[in-house]
A protein has these predicted regions:
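Membrane-helix boundary/helix-loop-helix interface segments in multi-pass membrane proteins
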Residues: 2-54, 60-195, 360-373, 379, ...
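Loop-to-helix entry and N-terminal half of a specific, functionally important transmembrane alpha helix
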Residues: 332-370, 377
């Protein structure tokens, strides 16, 4: 005896499925989160994973670099570990928060971001100098903020806004370049006044690159390069640089002239990087790190810790991860249909590429010492916050203005 089959229905000539053939099971939370056009699907997860790994490496290196001196002083050996881990976690939260903001809204916030940054750069001169520099603002609880790190973000937003608005009227001309310089010069002047030469170099390179990428006429760029180059050549040695900064450049050109003085940092850095061999001594087992022979080894010279304790394999891994960050930022710039987004992504890519090159270069002796942290790795809350906010800006551009959604 045959069983009764489920009824089927015909509506306007179309046969609908029989009863019971539809699945009533809802999709999983993960499936819904990564569904097409969902927020998480629009994120660049390669970029997120890479910066997370870099931050984790940084936490471990900072811990290894600071533990010996803290133990010798009878202090908590995990102090810097806890701080850096906390700052990295807060940085990731900031990254995700910024990624949810449409980049067009970021453009409307540019005047406020720029103004707040200028006020912060002015406020540092009301504080006491640390190691001869007015670079930090003291906050309750023993925390400090370094406004010059956020000047990179303010500059990129300001230049992107200027060139986007000028592009609506045609190819950017002299007026647009002068407006861009009017945004860049105050930041450069205040940062140099601190003094923070490394940050000033980043700001200068980002400014020059964004002017070129904006589509400004070549004759204007050439004339500007001649004028700026001549001005720097005339006053650079006597007014722009402090005596110790000139000494750093001299020691870079003649590294063996004063190994016990101006050339000490560079010499010890090269020894530390080269002593690790292929695989390094292992975390917490570096004799040069433990002896604290390299000054500022948890900040500007964190790459020396990687060189000694992680060896060539570890350092090349860090370089590869930083390279991926730059490539992903450039990829976002190429695949963006909005000029403001293109300039934002390009500015961030140049920032990370140049700063990484200078930091690593000064530890291996191919660049002078300028006092720049290694992005995502060096110790410091302001630096990692600025780095993560920049990654959030990249995610925002990708989510809202990317031509492709892969």
């Amino acid at each position: 005896m045959l069983g009764r089959s489920s009824p089927s229905y015909t509506v306007r000539g179309y046969s609908l499925p029989r009863v019971g053939t539809f699945s009533s099971r809802p999709r999983s939370l993960a499936a819904r989160a990564f569904a097409r056009n969902s927020v998480l699907r629009q994120m660049d997860w390669v970029l997120i994973v890479v910066v997370s790994v870099l931050s984790a490496i940084g936490v471990l290196l900072v811990w290894s670099a600071t533990q010996p001196s803290l133990l010798a002083a009878g202090a908590n050996p995990h102090t810097y570990l806890v701080k850096q881990a906390l700052w990295a976690a807060i940085g990731l939260i900031l990254m995700f928060a910024v990624s949810f903001i449409d980049s067009r809204r970021l453009r409307s916030w540019t005047p406020f971001v720029y103004g707040a940054t200028v006020l912060g750069l002015l406020a540092v001169f009301a504080t006491h100098a640390v190691n001869g520099a007015h670079a930090w603002i003291n906050l309750p609880g023993g925390f400090q903020v370094e406004p010059s790190e956020f000047a990179k973000i303010a500059l990129i937003l300001a230049l992107a806004t200027v060139f986007t608005q000028s592009r609506w009227r045609g190819t950017p001309g002299l007026r647009s370049v002068l407006l861009a310089l009017a945004c860049a010069v105050p930041l450069l002047a205040l940062v140099l006044k601190e003094p923070a030469l490394g940050v000033a170099l980043v700001l200068a390179v980002v400014t020059a690159t964004m002017i070129v990428l904006s589509g400004t006429k070549l004759r204007i760029i050439a004339a500007l390069a001649v004028i700026v180059g001549g001005a720097v050549a005339l006053v650079g040695g006597t007014h722009l640089l402090k005596s110790y900064q000139l000494t750093r450049f001299t020691s870079f050109l003649h590294p063996s002239a004063d190994l016990a003085g101006a050339g000490y940092n560079a010499a010890q850095a090269k020894i530390a990087v080269g002593s690790g061999g292929m695989f390094g001594t292992g975390l917490f087992h570096g004799s040069i790190v433990a002896g604290n022979y390299v000054p500022a080894q948890q900040t500007d010279f964190i790459f020396t810790v990687a060189g000694e304790e992680l060896g060539f394999v570890g350092t090349i891994t860090i370089v590869a991860l930083l390279f991926i960050v730059v490539v992903r930022a450039a990829r976002i710039a190429v695949r963006t249909d909005d000029l403001f987004g293109v300039l934002i992504a390009s500015g961030v890519a140049i920032w990370f590429a140049f700063q990484s090159f200078v930091n690593i270069g000064m530890t291996i002796g191919i660049m002078p010492i300028t006092g720049l942290p290694l992005p995502f790795v060096s110790y410091g809350g302001s630096a990692i916050f600025a780095d993560m906010i920049a990654i959030g800006m990249l995610q925002s551009v990708r989510r809202h203005h990317s031509v492709f959604t892969d």
